[in-house]
Amino acid sequence: MRECGMLLPVASLPSRYGIGAFSKEAYDFIDTLKAAGQSFWQILPLGPTGFGDSPYQSFSAFAGNPYFIDLEKLTEEGLLTREECLDADFGNDERDIDYKKIYDGRFPLLRKAYERWKAGRSPELVHELAGRKLGDETREYCFYMAVKNHFDSCSWNLWDEGIRLRKPEALEAYRAMLTDEIGFYEFQQIKFEEQWDALKRYAHEQGIRIIGDIPIYAAFDSADSWSRPELFQFDENNMPGAVAGCPPDGFSATGQLWGNPLYNWEYHRKTGFAWWMRRMEYCFRMYDLVRVDHFRGFDEYYAIPYGDATAEYGRWEKGPGIEIFRQMQEHFGGDKLPIIAEDLGFLTPTVRQLLKDTGFPGMKVLEFAFDAGENSDYLPHKYGSNCVVYTGTHDNDTAEGWFASLDEHDRNFVREYIGAGYTPEGEIHWDLVRAALGSVADLAVIPVQDYLGYDTSARINEPSTLGKNWRWRMSREDLNEDTVKRCRRLAGIYGRLGEA
């Protein structure tokens, strides 16, 4: 079945409170998707973020970002006043997220809401309610964040030895000492899940499904690595011997040093990949389809000695291969899992075979199609139908920004290949959209910025850089009636029209 969707991070939605949330604007965007003939909304990971603001470095694989809690709904519940929300300074740039102001302004409001919410409830009742509504791993995240705050937001490797190594007497003492702070984080997760479930339910009522995103690796500064050190390649002091990344290539002479702890795949095998089954249960409950980041890491992963300043001296190690996906099929009771494999970059024959064996759709990105001239596997005439095509992803420049960066030879090849000229001058983004929608790929997903024709300033992320990543926001006026009608018309022309 041919379908289409739009890619837009929740954080990039318009909002009067500085960052997108599960607010009226999210519901309006779902209405827009329906009007535009779309079937999917693809988002980025929803986990809580820290330094760097990357959704791919989260404090937990089983928790939600409190930035996305809708403050308006908390006012409707009597937990905040409108004046309290409007008095907070979240920044005044409708195009840019100021994460420092979000952090400084949002948590005091959430704490006020928590104080009112827990009024009349004993700490025991708060934790009992959390026990009914939240999973064990989510509650472990709440404990982790309470302890982390106790140690001035430091990562767990800098905590006192007893709690760092999770000695039973220390765990008991900190749970007792921080019971109210734990309750504060449990409150956040309860509200996050309530609001997300309501938004997802509304999306389904409108015929829109959600494509989520799951990073392959857990962050070092996370509840996952602290609470379950046996899952990772840690020594007797719970420190990594090697960390994750990518080797040097044409884009980076020293490679990419991500710094995430690597999995102890032998332990995962012995336990039937139980932690991964729990993780996928959480994701399948949250989303309708799940994009699995860095799929090739399940075949082979790049291990960089811990402490190295660059990724130059890593080595390739074998991953779990098809075994983990066979276990998922058995666990979830079906051959066809709702997974999209992020299979971008250099692919070895064994990675290609793994993708074929799983049957998962891979990804095709048009911005990569013209790097190797006529030999590129990303050119639409080389696709099979079992794939998802994008003009670009969150890691790419916008279509307009990308095209402007090409030399004249490559621009001419792009124009010649996609038949540029059907649309008015200066609308190369629409030509690329048409090429994606017209391909044989079962699903086409277009970043909102590429429907809007925005330049590099609307880019979401530039890998291996720090600074203004993850900050772009859409305005309320962007997806106007004319653009929505054009999206719907193209979806119809190419046989991808969603439910009316």
Region spans (language model):
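Alpha-amylase-like alpha-glycosidases and glucanotransferases acting on alpha-linked glucans and related
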Residues: 9, 15, 53-193, 218-445, ...
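Catalytic domains of carbohydrate-active enzymes, especially glycoside hydrolases
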Residues: 24-49, 286-287
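Conserved, well-ordered alpha-helix/loop/beta-strand core segments that scaffold catalytic motifs
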Residues: 185, 189-218
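Outer-envelope exported proteins of Gram-negative bacteria
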Residues: 44, 209-211, 215, 289, ...
